[in-house]
Protein backbone atom coordinates (compact mmCIF):
# COMPACT_ATOMS: atom_id res chain seq x y z
CA UNK A 1 0.00 0.00 0.00
CA UNK A 2 1.42 3.35 -1.03
CA UNK A 3 1.07 6.17 1.49
CA UNK A 4 0.40 9.56 -0.03
CA UNK A 5 1.11 12.83 1.64
CA UNK A 6 -1.92 14.94 2.40
CA UNK A 7 -0.74 17.58 -0.09
CA UNK A 8 -1.31 15.07 -2.90
CA UNK A 9 -5.04 15.11 -2.22
CA UNK A 10 -7.15 17.53 -4.19
CA UNK A 11 -10.55 18.88 -3.36
CA UNK A 12 -13.43 17.19 -5.17
CA UNK A 13 -14.45 19.93 -7.60
CA UNK A 14 -18.06 18.71 -7.88
CA UNK A 15 -18.61 18.72 -4.13
CA UNK A 16 -16.79 22.02 -3.82
CA UNK A 17 -19.16 23.59 -6.36
CA UNK A 18 -22.10 22.75 -4.07
CA UNK A 19 -20.73 24.95 -1.30
CA UNK A 20 -21.40 28.65 -0.82
CA UNK A 21 -18.86 31.41 -1.20
CA UNK A 22 -18.69 31.79 2.57
CA UNK A 23 -18.06 28.05 2.95
CA UNK A 24 -15.29 28.28 0.36
CA UNK A 25 -13.57 31.11 2.18
CA UNK A 26 -14.12 29.46 5.55
CA UNK A 27 -12.42 26.27 4.36
CA UNK A 28 -9.58 28.25 2.82
CA UNK A 29 -9.24 29.95 6.20
CA UNK A 30 -8.33 26.63 7.82
CA UNK A 31 -5.40 26.10 5.46
CA UNK A 32 -4.28 29.71 5.78
CA UNK A 33 -4.25 29.30 9.56
CA UNK A 34 -2.33 26.03 9.31
CA UNK A 35 0.27 27.60 7.02
CA UNK A 36 0.76 30.59 9.31
CA UNK A 37 1.03 28.40 12.41
CA UNK A 38 3.51 26.06 10.72
CA UNK A 39 5.60 29.02 9.56
CA UNK A 40 5.69 30.46 13.08
CA UNK A 41 6.69 27.07 14.47
CA UNK A 42 9.42 26.65 11.85
CA UNK A 43 7.83 23.52 10.38
CA UNK A 44 8.62 23.96 6.68
CA UNK A 45 7.06 20.63 5.63
CA UNK A 46 3.68 21.44 7.20
CA UNK A 47 3.86 25.00 5.94
CA UNK A 48 4.44 23.85 2.36
CA UNK A 49 1.63 21.31 2.55
CA UNK A 50 -0.82 23.85 3.93
CA UNK A 51 0.16 26.37 1.25
CA UNK A 52 -0.33 23.68 -1.40
CA UNK A 53 -3.79 22.81 -0.07
CA UNK A 54 -4.75 26.48 0.17
CA UNK A 55 -3.71 27.06 -3.44
CA UNK A 56 -5.84 24.08 -4.49
CA UNK A 57 -8.85 25.50 -2.62
CA UNK A 58 -8.29 28.95 -4.13
CA UNK A 59 -8.14 27.38 -7.61
CA UNK A 60 -11.27 25.33 -7.01
CA UNK A 61 -13.07 28.46 -5.82
CA UNK A 62 -12.04 30.39 -8.92
CA UNK A 63 -13.27 27.50 -11.07
CA UNK A 64 -16.67 27.65 -9.38
CA UNK A 65 -17.23 31.39 -9.65
CA UNK A 66 -15.70 32.17 -13.04
CA UNK A 67 -18.27 32.86 -15.71
CA UNK A 68 -21.23 33.00 -13.32
CA UNK A 69 -23.49 35.92 -12.60
CA UNK A 70 -21.55 36.19 -9.34
CA UNK A 71 -18.15 36.44 -10.99
CA UNK A 72 -17.60 39.68 -9.05
CA UNK A 73 -16.60 37.30 -6.24
CA UNK A 74 -13.52 36.43 -8.28
CA UNK A 75 -11.90 39.77 -7.54
CA UNK A 76 -12.01 39.10 -3.80
CA UNK A 77 -10.83 35.49 -4.14
CA UNK A 78 -7.93 36.41 -6.42
CA UNK A 79 -6.90 39.36 -4.25
CA UNK A 80 -7.04 37.18 -1.12
CA UNK A 81 -4.94 34.52 -2.84
CA UNK A 82 -2.37 37.11 -3.90
CA UNK A 83 -2.12 38.51 -0.37
CA UNK A 84 -1.81 35.02 1.10
CA UNK A 85 1.01 34.08 -1.28
CA UNK A 86 2.72 37.45 -0.85
CA UNK A 87 2.85 36.72 2.86
CA UNK A 88 5.13 33.74 2.31
CA UNK A 89 7.12 34.84 -0.72
CA UNK A 90 7.71 38.60 -0.35
CA UNK A 91 9.33 38.61 3.06
CA UNK A 92 6.48 40.51 4.76
CA UNK A 93 5.34 37.70 7.04
CA UNK A 94 6.02 39.42 10.36
CA UNK A 95 4.10 42.56 9.41
CA UNK A 96 1.10 41.00 7.68
CA UNK A 97 0.44 37.52 9.08
CA UNK A 98 -1.97 38.63 11.81
CA UNK A 99 -4.01 40.79 9.42
CA UNK A 100 -4.34 38.07 6.80
CA UNK A 101 -5.18 35.46 9.42
CA UNK A 102 -7.84 37.79 10.88
CA UNK A 103 -9.39 38.41 7.44
CA UNK A 104 -9.82 34.69 6.80
CA UNK A 105 -10.90 33.92 10.36
CA UNK A 106 -13.95 36.14 9.90
CA UNK A 107 -15.05 33.87 7.05
CA UNK A 108 -14.45 30.79 9.18
CA UNK A 109 -16.67 32.21 11.92
CA UNK A 110 -19.33 33.25 9.43
CA UNK A 111 -19.34 29.84 7.74
CA UNK A 112 -19.61 28.08 11.10
CA UNK A 113 -22.43 30.39 12.17
CA UNK A 114 -24.35 29.77 8.94
CA UNK A 115 -23.89 26.01 9.34
CA UNK A 116 -25.16 26.22 12.91
CA UNK A 117 -28.20 28.24 11.80
CA UNK A 118 -29.00 25.64 9.11
CA UNK A 119 -28.81 22.87 11.70
CA UNK A 120 -31.18 24.76 14.01
CA UNK A 121 -33.61 25.32 11.14
CA UNK A 122 -33.59 21.62 10.30
CA UNK A 123 -34.28 20.74 13.94
CA UNK A 124 -37.25 23.13 13.93
CA UNK A 125 -38.64 21.57 10.75
CA UNK A 126 -38.31 18.03 12.09
CA UNK A 127 -39.72 19.02 15.47
CA UNK A 128 -42.81 20.56 13.83
CA UNK A 129 -43.61 18.55 10.68
CA UNK A 130 -46.07 20.24 8.37
CA UNK A 131 -45.35 23.73 9.71
CA UNK A 132 -43.10 26.29 8.04
What are these regions (language model features)?
Residues 1-132:
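Surface-exposed peri-terminal alpha-helical interaction modules
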